[in-house]
Amino acid sequence: IDDYQQACFDGRISWIGEDTLARFMDAVLEQSQETPEESAEPIRVLYTPLCGTGLECVSQVLGRIGIPYLDVVPGQDQPDGDFPTCEYPNPEERAALQAGIDKCRSWKEMGKPFDLLLATDPDADRVGVACEDGDDYTLVTGNEMGILLMDYLAGRRVARGEDLSRLVAVTTIVSSAMCDDVAAHYGFELRRTLTG
């Protein structure tokens, strides 16, 4: 710790400032295919960072794209490396999302259902989604999400009149073969890489 404190004092280590976060948010939003004005109607999102670091960035991005209602799963909003409310904080595992699913159910019973349960892993580089499915909530797998995003992004470009024949999408060797079908449908090249 002495070396760390000395490095901070000497200016060799510095904290990332709000300006860096703002530039990051701008870069993320530049990738958006749709503005809030184009959206059919506002959605209600329940979010959990699973006791990790995602709350600030995710809530800012969702707010800036016009999500009018964002609520957070209680007890999972602040970073806590002991993960007291979810033993295994993987957003693709149902057990990790159970507190969020329970809150979705209770709000649905009150007549205020959420449209989407969104979760990020503790370092906010993986995402999980659960959607209402009758009386239950279904998790969208990583493969399903990738295919949905690929189809959505390609479809938006086609709707704007873009020629996709010169585009290349990249996925991994473990991703669903449906990626090939989406690429063939829209006429762009798909390349596969090793994982990691």
Give the ranges of each region predicted by the language model.
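Gly/Ser/Thr-enriched, mixed-charge loops and adjacent short helices
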Residues: 1-110
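Proline/glycine-rich low-complexity loops and linkers
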Residues: 2-16, 133-196
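Short helix-terminating capping/connector loops at secondary-structure junctions
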Residues: 38-41, 110-113, 160-166
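Structured core elements
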Residues: 44-48, 71-72, 117-119, 126-130, ...
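Gly/Ser/Thr-rich loops at beta-strand to alpha-helix junctions
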Residues: 49-55, 124-126, 174-177
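Short, ordered loop/turn segments at secondary-structure junctions
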Residues: 75-78, 122, 174, 195-196
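Glycine-rich phosphate-binding loop
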Residues: 104-134, 182, 188-192, 196
